[in-house]
Amino acid sequence: MLEIEALYVPLSKLRNIGIMAHIDAGKTTTTERILYYTGRKHVLGSVDEGTATMDWMEQEKERGITIKAAATTCFWKEHRINIIDTPGHVDFTVEVERALRVLDGAVAVFDATAGVEPQSETVWRQAERYSVPRIAFMNKMDKTGADFFMSIKSMVEKLHAKPVAIQVPIGAEKDFIGVVDLIEMKAITWTSEDGSEFIKHEIPENMLDLAEEMREEMISMLAEEDEELLELYLEEQELPVEKIKDILRKATINNKLVPVLCGAAARNKGIQPLLDAVVDYLPSPIDIPAVKAITPSGEEIQIPPSVEGDFAGLAFKIQTDPYVGKLAYVRVYSGKLEKGSYVYNSTKQIRERVARLIFMHADKREDAEYARAGDIVAIIGLKNTTTGDTLCSQERPVLLEKMSFPEPVISIAIEPLTRDDEERMVKAVAALSEEDPTLRINVDRETGQVVLSGMGELHLEIVTDRLKREFGVNVRVGRPQVSYRETIRQTGTAEGKYVRQTGGRGQYGHVIMKFEPLPLDGEKQFEFINKTVGGVIPREYIPAIEEGVKEAMEMGVLAGYPMIGVRAVLLDGSYHEVDSSEIAFKVAASLAFKNAMKICQPVLLEPVMKLEVVVPEEYVGGIIADLNARRAQIESLESRINLRVIKAFVPLSELFGYATTLRSLSQGRAVHVAQFSHYKEAPDKVVEKVLKVV
C-alpha cells in the first residue's frame, strides 16, 4: 500500500505520463520494471507468463497483450509518477487516444530490431495532435538484429521527428551490457541478475571515439535551441551538465527535440536511467500550457493548474467494475475535489455526488479523501457521467474541449441463446458501450438483431468474450460485416418544407439548403454553414436545422449506411410567428437533405486498411500475388535485416480470414498488422453485392 498522504507532492514534482508503442515492442514489460525498481512491487512481472501487474484482464493474461489502458502510481527521486500503460494493438487505439488527451508527457517504446512500426506511427500522430512531449526508449537491445542507429534513423524518416541520442549502447544483441551516458560521459553497466544493481565507470577505450562523436552531435542540436550554450560551444568551453539538462528539458517540453535512450527491459537493463529521464525531461502539470475552456457566456478562458483554483476536470474513461460498479477516471486540471462532495457535470448540466475517490494501481484500489490539480483519480458515484464530460464547480461552470474518437469499420450481429441471456445482454452491451466510445450498438429494425460495430476483428472478439465472462451472457455471433459509408459526388440545392395544420397550434418549418462534397481525407467529415441574412429564420432554430441534417445523414439513401464528407449550407427559408418550432425545422432540414440527394449522386464508400506484412524473402512472390487478388494497392517493398516488409492498401472486405491464408502461404513465418487508413469509392461489383443484401 502507498501512504496516501505521500501522494500529494508539489505540482513541480508530479509527472503524468503514458507508455506507448507498437504491439510487442515491450511497453508493459518496461512498465513492470519501472514498478519493480521504484519499489511499487517486489516481484518481476512477466507478460509472457501472464503475471504482469498492468495486464490484469483475463483476456490480457491469455493473449499476452494490453487491451485496456491501466493506471498506476510510483515514486522516483522524490517525484511522483502517474503512469498509464496503453495498448499497442490498433483495435484498441481509443485507449491511447483518451490517455494522451489527459497526460502531460509520454515514453515511446520502440523495438530496436524494427525501429518505427505501423502502430508506432499511429500513436506518434495521436501524441502530435495533443502536443504531448515525448522521450524515446529503444528496447530489446539484446535481441538479434538490434540496431540503435537504424531505429533513430527510422524516427527521422517515418515520424519526421528530431531525435537526439543522450545514450549509446555498450555492445549489442547478446553482448549488450549497458549504456554510455552522453551528458555525464560515464558508462553504466548492470551487475545483478534482477537489474537492481549497476555501476557507473569510465567509458571503455574502444567506445570513446563513438561517444565523443555522438556527444558532439547532441551538443550541436542543443546549441540550436539556446544562444548561451551556442556561445560556450563555439568557444569550446566546458559545458556544465546541469545547463545541458536544463536546455534539453525545455526543448523536450516545447516538442523541439526527442531525447533517445536504450535498454533491454526483459533483461532488466536501462530502466533506472529511463526513470531519471522521465523526471529530468518530461513536464510537470505547471510546465505545459493552461487547459482551454468555454464559459456559459461563450468566452474562451484558460485554466492554470492550481490547487487553489476552482475545481475543473475531464472524465476521460468509464469502466465497469464487478465489485464497485461504475468508475469514472478523471484528470483534475484545477482545484480540489473531496470525497462526499458534489460535482457539477457541465456537459450534461447535472449535479452528481462523489461517493468515493480512488487512486488505481492496475485493478487494485486505494481510497483517498481528496484529489487535487494534476491528479488522475477514479470516482465512484457518478451515475450519469460519460467519456468526455467536463466536471467542475457549479458556482463557476466551464466546458472543456470534448474528446473525438474514430468511427468503427467492422460489425457483427449477436443473438442471445436463451430468454435469460436476452435480458442480461441488454444491460451488458449498454455497460460495454459506455466504457468504449468506439463500440457502437444498433438494433436492426427488421430482424431485431443486435449489431455491434468496432475497430477490428480482435476488438469485437474481446467484446463478445467479455459478455460471456464478465456478464454471464451466452450469445451466437454472426460473421463479420464491413461498415460501409456513403457520400455525394455532386453539389445540389433543395427545399424542405414541413407544414402541419390540425386544430390548435400547427407546425411550420421551411429551409432552402445546398449540399456539397467535402474531401474524404480532410479533418472534417461534416460541416454546417449558416448563410441566411436578415433574420429569415430566427437564430434559436438554427441548431435544430443542423441536427435535422445530421440525423438524416445517419441513414444514407443508397444502402442505409451513415453518410460522411458532406457540407450543408443553409441559404434561405421562412418561419411562422406562432407555428414554427425546433421540431418543425428539424423535419424541414431532413426533407431538404432527402430531396437534394436526388441530384447529389450518392455513392458507396468502402473502408481501406493499411497493411504491413513482414515475411522471409522466399515467400514474397506468393504473398504479393495473393494481395493483388484481394484488390490491394502495393505501396512499397522494403528490406529489414533478413526479412522483407510489404506495405499495401487493401479493402477491409478482402481481409476477412487473411491471417489463416498468410499462415498457409508463409508456413507460419509471416506476421501482419492492418489498421484503418481511409474510405474510398467502392467499385460497381461491390456496390451490386451490397445492394443485393440491403
Swiss-Prot record:
Q: Determine the domain of life of the protein's source.
A: Bacteria
Where, subcellularly, is it found? Answer: Cytoplasm
Q: Which GO terms describe its molecular function?
A: GTP binding; GTPase activity; translation elongation factor activity
List keywords of the entry alphabetically. Cytoplasm, Elongation factor, GTP-binding, Nucleotide-binding, Protein biosynthesis
Database matches in InterPro entries: EF-G-like_DII, EFG_II, EFG_III, EFG_III/V, EFG_IV, EFG_V, EFG_V-like, G_TR_CS
Binding of GTP, residues: 21-28, 85-89, 139-142
Q: Which GO terms describe its biological process?
A: ribosome disassembly
Q: Which GO terms describe its cellular component?
A: cytoplasm
Residue ranges of every copy of the tr-type G domain listed in the record: 12-286
Keyword presence, Cell division: no
Signal peptide stretch? none
Question: So what does this one do?
Answer: Catalyzes the GTP-dependent ribosomal translocation step during translation elongation. During this step, the ribosome changes from the pre-translocational (PRE) to the post-translocational (POST) state as the newly formed A-site-bound peptidyl-tRNA and P-site-bound deacylated tRNA move to the P and E sites, respectively. Catalyzes the coordinated movement of the two tRNA molecules, the mRNA and conformational changes in the ribosome.
Q: Which family does it belong to?
A: Belongs to the TRAFAC class translation factor GTPase superfamily. Classic translation factor GTPase family. EF-G/EF-2 subfamily.
| Name the record gives this protein | Elongation factor G
Organism equals Pseudothermotoga lettingae (strain ATCC BAA-301 / DSM 14385 / NBRC 107922 / TMO)
The coding gene here is fusA
